[in-house]
Amino acid sequence: MKYWIFKYPFILKLFLNLFPPLFFSGIKITYISQDFHRFQIKLRNWPGTRNANGSQFGGSLFSMSDAVYGTILMAILGDKYYVWDKKSVINFKHPGFGAVYLEGVITPLFIREIIEHTKNGEKYFPTVFATVHDKKGNEIATVSRTLYVRLKLSLIHITEPTRQ
């Protein structure tokens, strides 16, 4: 991936909003903070995202967090790390009628834990949690995503013991 995309939040936001899987699903990134640690996502209400009951399609709700957490984490960590989605779980609480929202936060402590667990090239599988809510604040679903994070092997400094 071209790392100039991660240089400024507005460039990443534009890139994600034009990314076909999100764009054609009615998903829009509405905000990314200057330090990339906070972001907001909106799933618009239109016929392409509604199910037979008129509420938001579960797959669209699930897609709100897909690719975004990993991509935001890549922006924070830089090009020294591999970041992929490994596993994801959604728990539907209530039907979502109308536009729904997800607000994500990646804390400095979370980043420090990743750096500590991966400093020698180990794989690390942190989990992030998010809540999807409607405009009244009602909880529609909760999502957990387990990520795969690893320092790129070419950047690991392995020291060989000296022989005497």
Label each PLM-derived region with a short phrase:
Residues 24-29, 86-92, 113-115:
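Short structured motifs
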Residues 72-109:
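Hydrophobic beta-strand-centered segment that forms part of the acyl-chain substrate-binding groove
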Residues 156-164:
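Conserved small/polar residues in nucleotide/adenosyl-binding loops
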Residues 24-55:
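Catalytic strand-loop segment that frames the active site of acyl-thioester-processing enzymes
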Residues 1-24, 48:
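Alpha-helical membrane-targeting segments
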Residues 25, 37-39, 84-88, 98-102, ...:
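A generic structural signal for short beta-strands and their flanking turns/coil linkers
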